[in-house]
C-alpha cells in the first residue's frame, strides 16, 4: 500500500511529462541543448552510485542490500544490465554529449566552473541528504522516487533521437 501510494504520487509529477521532456520528444531541441542537458544530468548520475551505497550501508535487510549492491555495480559499470555489456552510466552520458558536440572536459568541469544550474545543485544536495536518512526514507526517495522514473523517461525520449534528431543507433 505504501509503495503504491508513493508510485501514484510520482505519477502525478513524473519527469516524463515535464515541459523539457515534451520539447525533447517533439523534436524542438537542438544538439547543443541536448548537450547542455547532459552537462546537468551528468552531475546527478555520476554521484548516484555513491548515494545508493550510503543507503546500502544503512540497510538492515540482506535481500535489499543485495539489490542495492547490484544497483551500484550496474551504475559503476562492473556488470551489464539486461544482457548488455558493462558500462558506467555516467560514461554513456559523456559519450552522448560528445556526439552532440560538447567536449568531455566541459561536462566534467561544469561544477568547478560554476556552470551547474541551481536546480542541479539542489538535486545533488537533496540526494546527498536523502541517502543518509533512515533506510526506508532513503530507499523511497532515491530509488522509488527518482530512479524508478528512468525507464519511462528514456522509453519516451530515446525514439525521437533516432526519428527526429537524426542520431544513429550507435550514437544513441
Predicted regions and their residues:
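Acidic, low-complexity proline/glycine-rich segments
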Residues: 1-21, 115-119
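Alpha-helical bundle segments that constitute or directly flank the non-heme di-iron/ferroxidase center
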Residues: 9-14, 24, 28-60, 78, ...
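Helix N-cap / loop-to-helix initiation motif
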Residues: 30, 60-61, 103, 168
